[in-house]
Every structure is written in structure tokens, then in C-alpha cells.
Amino acid sequence: MTEENRSTDDEQSTDATDQSAEDVDAPSLSPDELHDRIRRGEAVHLLDVRNRDEVEAWRITGENVEATQVTYAEFAAAKARGEVGEFVADLDLREPVVAVCPRGEVSATVAELLREEGVDARNLDSGMEGWARVYVARELPSEETDATVLQYDRPASGCLAYLVVSGHEAAVIDPLRAFADRYVADAEEFGAELRYAIDTHVHADHVSGVRRLADEEGAQAVLPAGARERGLADALDARLVEDGDEIRVGDATLTALHAPGHTTELTALRLGGDSPSDSILFSGDALFTDSFGRPDLERGDEGARDLAGTLYDTLTEDLLALPDETLVAPGHRTPDAVPNPGENDTFAARLDAVADRLRIPDEKGVFVDRVLESLPPRPANYGEIIPANLGRESLDDETAFEVELEPNNCAVAAMD
């Protein structure tokens, strides 16, 4: 993705201007349509009229996405001077253009100004809030297992979840509260009842849907046993699993695999096939297709070194020691990740390909040092999200949605 920044230091809040923008009826593009274009690899030019800091914190990305950032205040000033034509010409926009703002209001005004100047422009309906509601499901290759597996992708954050269906039973792994109804509906489409709602660990980047699915849909909550040591509230009547425990879903079996490092309690799940090489590994945030989980969210900087060492042991002795053909189904993807055409265009990959990509150093100390040097900024609201996922604090739906509106940042940055 390329991005051009044209904003000045004298910026005006797009939250404020969203409320005062003129009521216009510019042609719009739905967030789902935008996602489909990006997924197909079509060239997309975004004109993002949010402030620079908002764009730098969270933006729409993709392999062929180009973005120009100009504040709405600059457009308003150009209009007041009667110089919109000259201002737009200087932007040198590549058509068609999609205008973006927080809620799709001021960007509608900008799209209309562009169209008045002869630019092929559309407004992103509902803006970034609409983008955060895009949720896409694709089926993972699972012919050798006793289950059908859907991978859910939230492009706005890179969060991935999974629905495992076998016979008339289903389990959802790492569900998001914002989409709890979706898992139930999709299970019903397969003629199954959602029996289990499972978290691989205490999440720091999104509000878990496990509690809602347990309370409102009757699903059995399943969490790693170590979540109790992290302060899991007793009010949640959860089944706690340890290494080697099995969860039966119809004719399929999920086997727990303790995989600490990102957090102390993280427990991956393996869906077995006819042979060990036919399995799917739901790795949570322990292992991604191009990275692995950061070790500093549970115990901060003070405990990060020890957990990084634990992560090294988990990767080298447990996860990467599984059969090469194991399909890694991670808990997140990077914003710029490209779907894997060899795995039904999902964000999954064979374990041998993942191992080749990661190039884990032979020496633990070298690995630990590189991890600690490669930590990106922490998730923006993890201090609110973790207590909510432990059941220690309560967030209403609006607040729960808002605290997730940034990239997940749960992975270690790429290491050279």
C-alpha cells in the first residue's frame, strides 16, 4: 500500500466536522463492496479525510490500495476561497476515488465536491465504523478431518475466528462479541447447534464473545485452565482445559495443546484427521503464518524476557515439531496479508511453509533479544479489554465496539 500525506499541522477533528457536514447524497460504496474489490486485487484509491494521527493509527490497507490523506478542514477552506478546482487538481488523484471518514458523513460532502469537479468519486458508506463491521467467512480445507471449518476474517483488525461443525454440533474458537449472532446463524445453516464457545487465551485486542454465547445461547464456555490464575471471574461457568484434554464436537475431536509465551495460559487446539499429518492447528496468538505472539501484554516489560524464552520453547519443542503438513489456522493476520490461494484463499498455511518463513534462530538468547527489539506499539485499549475478558469489568456494546477500532498489534513485528 502507498500513502500520500497532504495534511497540515493545523487540523480539525473529523469527529466534530462529521456532525456539522452538509446533508448530501453522494454515490456510495458499501464496506463489503470495498472489501471485495481489495480482495480481488483491484486497484483502489482512497481519499482519507480524517486527521493524520487517526490515519496513522488505523487505516484501510491492501495489496493494491493507494491512499491520500487530506483533512476535511482543508476541503472546507478551499471551498470558502472558491478554489476547490485548483485544490483537487493539485491532489492528482487516480480515479475512481473512494472518500473515507469516521462515519461516512463528511466524506460524503468531499465525494460530492470531487464529483462537481469531474472526478469519479464515491463515498464509503458508514466510513471506518462500517469498515469495522465487515466480517467474512471462508471454508478451510478440511477434507481429511471429520468436520467442516469456517475461518472468519475481520479485515479492519485482522482478527480471525473459526467455526468447527461436525454432525449436528458446532464449536466456535476465539469468537468476537460484536459478531456473536453470526456464529449461531452459520451453525444453524449447517443444521448444527453451537455447543461450545472457546477462547484460546485471554485476549487483549478484542472483546470476547464467549460469555455472550454462553449466557444467551447456552453454549458451553471453554477456556484454558491458566485463565483462573490470571483472575478469571468465578461467575463464568466455564470448562477449563489443560494440555491433552479433548473436546468432542460431533464426530470430530479438538485436542488441547498448552502453548505459553504470548500469555502464560494460551492453549492451542488441534483438530485431528485420519493421520497426524492431516490435522488443523488453531494456534491462537502463539503462532501466525508470518510471525508469533508478542510476550509483553500479560506481565509488561518486566516479564517480557521470561515469556519470550517460554515462547521460544513452545515454538521449537511443540508447535514447529508437529508434522509439516499440519495446517496452521492462526488467531490473527497482518493488515497487508494476502490470502493463500493454496488453502481456499484463507489466511492459513502449512506448518513447513510457516517455519521456513519465520527462520527461528538456533540460540534462544538471540531469539529473545530479537523479539524484544521488534515489539510494535501495544493494542490501544488492552488495559480495558483484558479486564472485560476476565469478567472483572463490564462494557456495553457501544463501548466494546469502540475499544476494538484499531489494528490488533498482538504480533511481533517481522524480524530480519
Predicted regions span which residues?
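Positively charged, proline/Ser/Thr-rich regional signature most characteristic
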Residues: 22-95
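Ser/Thr-glycine-rich phosphate-binding loops at phosphate-binding pockets of nucleotides
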Residues: 107, 198-201, 259, 263, ...
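Accessory terminal helices/loops
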Residues: 2-27, 42, 112-117, 313-416
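Cysteine-dependent PTP/DSP-like catalytic domain, specifically the C-terminal lobe
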Residues: 123-141
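Active-site HxH/HxHxD metal-binding segment of metal-dependent hydrolases
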Residues: 133, 177-258, 279
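Conserved beta-strand hairpin/beta-sheet module of binuclear metal-dependent hydrolase folds
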Residues: 51, 140-189, 269-283, 289-290
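Catalytic cysteine-centered active loop of the rhodanese-like fold, especially the PTP/DSP P-loop
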Residues: 70-72, 81-129
